[in-house]
Swiss-Prot record:
Function, as annotated: Toxic component of a type II toxin-antitoxin (TA) system. Its toxic effect is neutralized by coexpression with cognate antitoxin ParD3 but no other ParD or RelB antitoxin.
Alphabetical keyword list: Toxin-antitoxin system
Database matches in InterPro entries: RelE/ParE_toxin, RelE/ParE_toxin_dom_sf
Protein name stated in the entry: Toxin ParE3
Disulfide bonds listed in the record: none
Provenance organism: Caulobacter vibrioides (strain ATCC 19089 / CIP 103742 / CB 15) (Caulobacter crescentus)
Family: Belongs to the RelE toxin family.
One Pfam match: ParE_toxin
Originating gene: parE3
């Protein structure tokens, strides 16, 4: 089992998830959502190819849904590198700055 490595933007993404969910559903639901996302990180370390291949957006990119959020990651050998946590209701290509 590889390590989970978080890139710098992930911390801000998790803060945004908490803030957005908290505004609409309260602290308890927001905390539960963060716990779900964190559990996905550990699951991906055990099963790194579990997510969907999204090389159409960026070479090597994979995504895993924690509705409505998308965990974007790539593999680096045995390690899982978490790149971003983005809103899956929005166009991922646009959020990544890719023209469609």
């Amino acid at each position: 089992m590889g390590r989970v490595i978080r890139t710098r933007p992930v911390s801000g993404d998790l803060d945004r998830v908490f803030r957005d969910v908290c505004e609409n559903n309260g602290v308890k639901v927001a905390s539960a959502q963060l716990n779900r996302i964190e559990s996905v990180f550990h699951r991906l370390s055990a099963f790194p190819r579990l997510g969907r291949d999204r090389s159409d957006l960026r070479p090597g990119l994979r995504t895993f849904s924690v509705k409505p959020w998308q965990v974007l990651y790539r593999l680096n050998g045995e390690d899982v590198v978490i790149l971003r946590i983005l809103d899956g209701r929005m166009n991922l290509a646009a959020q990544l700055g890719k023209k469609t």
